[in-house]
Amino acid sequence: KINENAARTLEYAYNDWCIYQLAKALNRPKKEQKLFAQRAMNYRNIFDKESKLMRGRNEDGQFQSPFSPLKWGDAFTEGNSWHYSWSVFHDPQGLIDLMGGKAPFVQMLDSVFAVPPLFDDSYYGQVIHEIREMTVMNMGNYAHGNQPIQHMIYLYNYVGQPWKAQYWLRQVMDRMYTPGPDGYCGDEDNGQTSAWYVFSALGFYPVCPGTDEYVLGAPLFKKATLHLENGNNLVIDAPDNDENTM
């Protein structure tokens, strides 16, 4: 088997999609564009219809067995299947379809918060800090302390339940970013965890970097003004905003 094969497959698929977008913008030959467009769909190859989750495969192409979505590492990187199964930034509708449509997709999103913060650390042989942070956060199997799952909450918007996104976004911002000595929730790889907070506090987030799309969330402020490099201002105006109004 190849270590971290599921995580690599998912991230390479997204990378190939980004290359595809660049190839289109540069008007590269259609053959090149088609190649990377096809490779961007490779995430489908590790979707397990039975569990409705992403699952690692062996070199012979068979799914790794036995399979536990609570197992950290192995086919994944510092996370488990509950965390990585949402890593289809570039094709959320495709992921929704794989999981059976909107209702099953919502059920799977809900399950992340409903499944207790249990874990299998046998691959690492110890409780790595990312696992410890997930258990301390006590938000089910949602592990905001590491980057792979941080966009997941915004996916509620894609299936017509933005109020769930708004609720959980506020929960994360209020509980996992505080001024106390234990007030920061985990890794800060490439500035992602703080960038998540800045975007989310303003009320929008780039679920899929590589596009010009931002997904709406729940701003923390009644008004915020961003002074853009081109001299324009972006104003987020939410005069009725408070802790109970999202």
What residue ranges belong to the model's regions?
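C-terminal beta-sandwich/jelly-roll accessory domains of carbohydrate-active enzymes
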Residues: 241-246
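Active-site core of glycosidic bond-cleaving carbohydrate-active enzymes
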Residues: 1-41, 45-220, 224-235, 240
